[in-house]
Amino acid sequence: MARKYFGTDGIRGKANIFPMTPDFAMKVGIAVGVLFRSKATSRRVVIGKDTRLSCYMLENALVAGFTAAGMDAFLLGPIPTPAVAMLCRSLRADIGVMISASHNAFYDNGIKLFGPDGFKLSDEKETKIEALLDSDISELPLANCEEIGRAKRVEGDIYRYIEYAKRTLPRDVRLDALRIVVDCANGATYKAAPRALWELGAEVIAINDEPNGFNINQECGSTDLTSLRNKVHEVRADVGIALDGDGDRVLMVDEKGQMIDGDQLIAVIAEHWHKTGRLHHKGIVTTVMSNLGLERFLSEKGLKLIRTDVGDRYVVDMMRQKKYNIGGESSGHIILSDFCTTGDGLVAALQVLACMKESQQPMSQLCKRFEPVPQILKNKVVHNKNVLQKSEVQAALTKASEHLGKEGRLLVRASGTEPVIRVMAEGDDRKAMTAIVDDLITLIARHDHD
């Protein structure tokens, strides 16, 4: 059954437009508080946020809702999403909340929820929350006046996260002699990432580390590598790291300024962990968007690749089911379950840097683990995502899939967070893949206005 408020990564929308309004955010706080409060627990919620302007508004609204439901709110301030997941466990909270729209522009915002185990909530839990959200607010059982919650700002939380990230490396691993440019996307990692790298011994040049509420993900971070590439060239850095607005994804560039996507980063970590006996069950989990070249590379090494729907929560679910400890997406969500319950851009980057130090290879050599199969991906903004269900569109999709056969892949899907349909064709013939994608985009555009 389609969900009303939750997408693939929480509740998301434009700030001050439903559902990202203060009144609805307060109701979310009440509903989640009612569902998770228990007399057997501390009735505690941790709330983090990124650096967009509307976070102040939504944070206060959520605090009002949670405290009205009888929960104490621990406010973390601007902090990466994986830090919220970690601190949810560390502070023994009943629920964790991250206010962020990830890689989106400042005018969007969202609410991500984590359970007491640090994992994102299940579909079943989100369905229960939606049922409460659809009820009248006067029907929700608020706390009595003696049990109203309190709000408290947590001191030093960012330094706890930095230590946690550093501890994912062996104590003898240092990053001395590495010149690293880190692009913080003017987002939640602007303090933690440069500091962690510096404490590990690297020479750090931080860019896009001055958030002002509006510039998060603005021509920077993992969605736009231009400024990172330019700075790497300018300072002759060994490597560049691009994080997104909430720090749960990472892309990198080598010393030549060439992009290293999530698939290549996963390949580096998986190969190293396999050689050192750390890879569980000889396999990894990715999504349907990961390149066929990665699958071929792993197969040659006797490793399995399991694909899921797009969304790191689905990757994590499959990892838990199969007991795998590496998973991720080509977009840069990389989940290393030995350390993390969700994607962590800083931790993933540290593992790659450790491989770089051990191999003594330049980044351009280390991260060329496989030759990507040509993959043409285009996005089409639509008014109605149900355009994919129209008979002529369905027929065209079937025909294109049959044409590709076993020599390629076709993926057409509606985004879970944006009014966009993504069309991807993958195969060894780039020209043919481009033609297939262009034809389908044209067809979708025509029927979107029918």
Curated annotation (Swiss-Prot):
One of its GO terms (biological process) is UDP-N-acetylglucosamine biosynthetic process. Its cofactor is Mg(2+). It comes from the Bacteria. Mg(2+) binds at residues 102, 244, 246, 248. The modification Phosphoserine is found at residue 102. This is Phosphoglucosamine mutase. The gene is glmM. SUPFAM superfamilies: Phosphoglucomutase, C-terminal domain, Phosphoglucomutase, first 3 domains. Catalyzes the conversion of glucosamine-6-phosphate to glucosamine-1-phosphate. It holds the Pfam family PGM_PMM_IV. Belongs to the phosphohexose mutase family. GO terms for molecular function: magnesium ion binding; phosphoglucosamine mutase activity; phosphomannomutase activity. It is an enzyme of class 5 (isomerase). It catalyses: alpha-D-glucosamine 1-phosphate = D-glucosamine 6-phosphate. GO terms for cellular component: cytosol. The active site is at residue 102. Its EC number is 5.4.2.10. Activated by phosphorylation. Keywords: Isomerase, Magnesium, Metal-binding, Phosphoprotein. Binds 1 Mg(2+) ion per subunit.
